[in-house]
Amino acid sequence: MSNKESTYNKKNRLLAFTASITLILSLSSATIAQESYKKDFLYRRGTQLMLNGEPYQCASFNSFQLCGCGHDYELFSDCQIDSLFALLPKNIIVRTWATPAFSHRTDFLVEMARKHNIKLLLSLADGRSGCGDFDGAPNGDGSGKIADWYKEGYRKKYLPHVIEMVSKYKDAPEIAMWEIINEPADADWLTIRDFLHHIAAIIKKYDPNHLVESGTFAGWAYGGADNYKALHDSPNIDVGNLHEYDYDYENSNTIESWHFAPCLKAMQELDKVLIVGETGINSGDGDCRTTRSQRCDAMRSKFDIYLQKGAGAVFVWNLARESRNVGLTFGLDDPLWDLILTYPANERNSTTSNKNYTQKEKP
């Protein structure tokens, strides 16, 4: 073969290769552009939360008081919840309880979320057995659950509750995701894994429209990052969770928890979402090393670093109508509240539902 022919063949092969790559990229882009989603339902594209065809993140708060649990001075009236939700950035997610003991207010919360265009992350049980969720608790409030509850005990009360809740609200876009249980523990990790996988499959069976989130601690509670990853390797679990209160640990002023990176890596290897379901800093008007203003600044830094590194959402613990003590709880007069209302990611989400969609919507 002449040098001229060889050069000609190489050029043709290069052109063919380039054309193939271009075709693959264009098909991939077309697939993304035409992906199906249900309008106003939160979903995921791998490790990225999505809403109406747009990437989604938020910085928000927990408030178990919204479900009716708490001291009288902490609780919100129906009118106050209406006003509270009206102030929130559109499409923000609020995490609260919908446990067997405190699901009587869920209808109202969903109604208010629909009215004000926000979303709810609802936890279906409390592994710490708080707020009256004493099923499986060895010693009442805050005592956790016995190991046998995660093996068989959950089938008596909790499982019917799960089926009832997810069936009832399966068509409600106001639900951002279902949390299987808050902070499962007190059993070996294999038992907890089997429990999470079973409940996730049940939820998806009765409600294929919503994301399923684990509710877990970080990997330390389950023997390390590999076990944490195994807890989430079910195809029916979409979102992993970690809770961290490391700022006050040994007065370290920690911003990025040392548990975050291994949890994020585990979820990225599974091509799934990670959220920071709880983070908090002690403060208040009494004797405390951290002022409310300092707490707000530190929490802004936490929001920034977790979202920049890939978390889908971050939730501060914990909003109540009024906070009377030094602690993690904050009220509407706290700088944290203003931070949440004005945080850039939340303001961006406010316009998501008003965009012209180029992607295919499911009815």
Where are these regions (language model features)?
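Substrate-binding surface in catalytic domains of secreted glycosidases
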Residues: Y247-C263
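Active-site mouth of glycoside hydrolases
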Residues: Y37-V239, Y249-N251, K265, E269-K272, ...
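N-terminal secretory signal peptides that target proteins for export/translocation
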Residues: M1-N12
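Bacterial N-terminal signal peptides
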Residues: T18-S26
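Boundary at the C-terminal end of the N-terminal hydrophobic targeting segment
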Residues: T31-A33
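Carbohydrate-binding surfaces of carbohydrate-active enzymes
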Residues: A320, L339-P363
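Short acidic/histidine-rich active-site segments
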Residues: V276-T279
